[in-house]
Amino acid sequence: MKLLSAVVLLALANPSDGRADAAWATATVARLNALLEAPNSERAGAAERLVSEHLAVDEFAEVTFGDYLEKSLDAYRGLLSSPRFTHLVDHYRSRLARAYQHRLSADLAVQLASPDWRGLRLDSLEVNGQRGRAQLRALFATRSLGVEADLIFADGTWKIAELKIDGRPVSSHYRRRYQSLIDREHSPPVLEAQLAEREFVVLEDFAATWDGSQPMEWGPWKKKDRQKPVLYRVEGRPRRYMAARDSSHSVIVGKFVHWNPRQYPIMTWCWRAAALPLGGNEFLDDANDSAAGLYVIFSKNWLGVPKQLKYVWSTTLPEGTVGRRDKLFRPWFFVVESGAANLGKWTFEVVDLEKHHREKLGGRPAKRTIGLGLLTDANSTRSYAEAYYADLRVWTRQAFDGGRVVNHCGGLPVSNGVYSGENSP
């Protein structure tokens, strides 16, 4: 389906009176054909405008992805009220539509530069109220293809709701392109990253909240903790982060997020410890507190016990320490920051999830993770801990091996309007 994106050129201009007729459509096709002669720099901008202004992106995305969002977010259905679950789905629906729009624009810009494409010819146009259908031929140097555009008139403009090339829907092509991800119900940020053709997935940037401070997808992981005080809240402008403060409660907050850790095995994040629990030592029951802790829950074993790893900022254990408490089902932990040397500073962390899974949990990780957890606690030491978490990402191994995994902690506020000076994202 070589023309899969170029057919967005069928986007029809907006007649001032809302009518669609053959003369207007012919003029539009002529204008779009003229665009093929424009410089490449102009084509890219024109592709973005055409898709933005003339494609019914919401309808196109719904036809392409169906109920993918509802299925990928289904774990929240029993945890959120019906209005909140609907709001969560709508939040990601809007993000997915924007990502899809950018993908179509980028593909169209490439097709506009194809030397083999000669133009479009309008064969017929039928209009019935708020719906219409255009039949065209896409002309190439040695062949032509039939193109059918379903049109919808909404908000005072005609837009394309679906396209077919020689009878094959363009939406079906894109669905097939991402079929594996859709079938495995990986989380929306993964699909957004693949639509953007990025080498990393932003698992969490804490930009989405219910009320400005309560993170949209995070909540107490254990039922017994749901009645405890809220220890975590989103803060910061313009870049946001999760603030955690604890003295006696020790609440893990979790988020369901599903990605393939074989495809994206490198995890990076930013965190800052402001107060270390006194004498914290992750090996000891009576001192098992960490200023900051990040859990990665890969899967469950045959007993239903989570297969997970924990990365910590320890008060006393040296960086590089790996271990776990001598109790049943306790997770392996990795000390990636230690002590007060970097206290008050945003630090950038990089870990190889696949390597650590193989070393401590055995074999390769499952192809779909369960989620993430955060824990700042000081209950065992009866002291106080405070930390901040930001910008959790996973990367391809190719990006890591190629040196393209970069520090993305720049611009995070330290305190009183002072910002970190690391590289911007």
Spans of features found by a protein language model:
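Short carbohydrate-recognition loop motifs
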Residues: 228-252
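Surface-exposed, charged secondary-structure patches
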Residues: 85-146
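Extracellular/lumenal carbohydrate-interaction signature centered on repeated Trp-anchored short motifs
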Residues: 256-267, 340-343, 365
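Extracellular beta-strand elements of beta-rich domains used
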Residues: 206, 372, 390-394
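Extracellular carbohydrate-recognition regions
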Residues: 193-223, 403-422
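Early exported N-terminus immediately downstream of N-terminal targeting peptides
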Residues: 21-104
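Extracellular beta-strand ligand-recognition surfaces/modules
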Residues: 289-294, 329-339, 343-384
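Low-complexity, intrinsically disordered terminal/linker segments enriched in charged
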Residues: 162-202
